[in-house]
Design a protein with these regions (language model features):
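Metal-coordinating catalytic core of metallo-dependent amide/deamination hydrolases
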Residues: 102-234
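Acidic, glycine-rich loop-and-beta core segments that form the ion-binding/anion-interacting portion
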Residues: 223-226, 237-245
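N-terminal metal-binding scaffold of metallo-dependent hydrolase/deaminase domains
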Residues: 1-38
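Active-site metal-binding motif and surrounding structural segment of the metallo-beta-lactamase
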Residues: 36-51
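Divalent metal-coordination and catalytic microenvironments
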Residues: 9, 27, 47, 58, ...
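Metal-associated gating/positioning segment near the N- to mid-region
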Residues: 48-117
Length: 245
C-alpha cells in the first residue's frame, strides 16, 4: 500500500476552500481533514492551493506536437510525451486529445491515417510513462470526402469517447468573413492567391455533396455507440438549434 499525506494546503472543495490535509492511499483520496498533520513524512504545501485535476475536453496540443510546422512530422512517441508533460504541468489529469479526420483540400496531417497514435498511447501508458489519462476526441470535417475512411481506424478503440462535427467551408461559421479565411490560408497554409480563389470556388460544391451525408453518418454512429457528440464553431442561434436537434 502506497500512502502520501499533503498538509497545510488550501484545499478546494465543491463549495468551499479549507486549510487542511489530504491523505492519498494507492492513488486515491482516502480522507480530507481540517488542520495540519504532524505525521512524519507529510508534505507541507505551505498554504498553496490544492485542486482536483482538470479535465480538458478539446485541445489541439497533441496535433501541434505531431506536426509542429506545415509538412513537418515529429515522431509520435516523442510528440506524445512532450504533450503529456505540458498537459500535466497545467494541472490537467484527464485529457481528450483532439485529432482531426478529413481534409477537404487533401493536405496536412488530417488528410492522413493518424491512428498509429493509439498504439503509442497504449504503449506509453502500459510502461507507466504518461502522467495524465488520455482519451481521444475525434474532430470530423464534414465536407471532406475522406472523413469516414480516416475515422474508421479509431471507431472501436476504447480511448474514443467524444466526436465533434466541424465544417470549415469558407463563408460560414468560423470563416463567415472570407478575408479572415484568406489571411489564414495564404499565411499559415502558404497558399497562393490563385489556389485560395480556386478552393473558394470548389468549397460550396464539396460541402453540398459531402457535409449532410457525413453529418447523418457520424451522428448515427455516435448514438449507436454511446459516444458524446459536440458541434464546432456554432455562431448563430440557428446553429445552436441545429445542434440540439
Amino acid at each position: 500500500m502506497t500512502e502520501h499525506i499533503l498538509t497545510n494546503a488550501r484545499v478546494v472543495l465543491c463549495d468551499e476552500v479549507v486549510r487542511g490535509t489530504v491523505q492519498l492511499r494507492d492513488g486515491c483520496i482516502a480522507s480530507v481533514d481540517p488542520g495540519r498533520s504532524s505525521v512524519p513524512g507529510a508534505l507541507d504545501l505551505e498554504g498553496d492551493l490544492l485542486l482536483p485535476g482538470l479535465v480538458e475536453l478539446h485541445t489541439d496540443n497533441l496535433e501541434r506536437h505531431l506536426m509542429p510546422r506545415p509538412r513537418v512530422f515529429f515522431p509520435a512517441q516523442s510528440a506524445l510525451q512532450s504533450h503529456d508533460a505540458e498537459i500535466a504541468a497545467a494541472g490537467i489529469t484527464t485529457v481528450f486529445d483532439a485529432i482531426g479526420v478529413g481534409d477537404p483540400y487533401d493536405e496536412g496531417a488530417r488528410a492522413q491515417d493518424q491512428s498509429a497514435i493509439l498504439q503509442v498511447m497504449d504503449l506509453l501508458e502500459d510502461a507507466g510513462v504518461l502522467r495524465s489519462r488520455h482519451y481521444v476526441h475525434i474532430r470530423c470535417e464534414l465536407p471532406a470526402p475522406n472523413a469516414r475512411e480516416l475515422f474508421e481506424p479509431f471507431a472501436h478503440h476504447p480511448r474514443l469517447k467524444l466526436l465533434s462535427l466541424m465544417d470549415h467551408t469558407p463563408g460560414q461559421r468560423q470563416w463567415s468573413d472570407i478575408e479572415h479565411a484568406r489571411v489564414y490560408y495564404t499565411g499559415k497554409k502558404g497558399w497562393s492567391e490563385q489556389k485560395f480563389e480556386h478552393e473558394l470556388r470548389l468549397a460550396p460544391q464539396r460541402q453540398a455533396e459531402h457535409a449532410q451525408p457525413n453529418l447523418r453518418w457520424f451522428v448515427d454512429f455516435a448514438r449507436a455507440h454511446g459516444l458524446a457528440l459536440a458541434t464546432h464553431d456554432d455562431t448563430t442561434v440557428a446553429h445552436v438549434d441545429e445542434a440540439q436537434a
